[in-house]
Amino acid sequence: MCSTFQIIAHLHKLNSMDSDTFIFCLEAVADIETETASEVVKNLEQLAFKQGIASIYKTCDTIESLEESLNTLLYDDHNFKNYEIIYLVMQGEGNTICLNEYYYTLEEIAEIFEGKMKGKILHFANSKVLDLSNDEAQYFLDVTGARAISGYGTSSSTLTSSILDTLFFSLFEE
């Protein structure tokens, strides 16, 4: 299955960057075969242009395409260590994500990527409320090796978190 794949970078700024912070963004869509202009892509482009933070943007519509995208990043991208932030833009509630009307718990996701997210920060956009107990969060971090998991306590169908997410990401460049 192919998916939307874009490398977002402003080359002039990338060449002069002191740090190697990159963002890998994975957005859930109804059908990866249908290309649509996403607000997320526009915001990542602005982040690259203004802050010099490059990113890779992909879409997924099933748990298999999510796993395939992250495995491609893990095993085929020799710069994976530079991707400090894994940015997930998908629906869900509490301890689950939703892909094409199927719900997966973060425990299931953790087990798929057991030990593979060492040192990464997983950040969820506000389209998915991140409502985890301390034990659930610690389990996810312990199993995946991730450094942190972050997100929002409320979602909004009328207002996205893109601007706040952009500010959050820019903190890693300072």
Predicted features, each with a name:
Residues V41, E45, L106-E114, N134-L141, ...:
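Short amphipathic alpha-helical segments and helix-helix/interface helices
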Residues I53-K58, G115-K120, G153-T158:
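Short C-terminal domain-edge/linker segments immediately following a structured domain
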Residues A48-Q51, F80-E84, A110-F113, R147-S150, ...:
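Glycine-rich loops and low-complexity Gly/Arg-rich segments
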Residues C2-Y83, I121-A125, V143-T144:
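A domain-level signal for caspase-like cysteine endopeptidase catalytic cores
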Residues L130-E174:
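Active-site-proximal C-terminal subdomain of hydrolase catalytic domains
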Residues A28-D31, E93, V129, S156:
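Conserved beta-strand elements of beta-rich interaction domains across eukaryotes
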Residues S38, S69-N71, E101, A137, ...:
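Surface-exposed beta-strand edges and their flanking turn/coil or helix-capping segments
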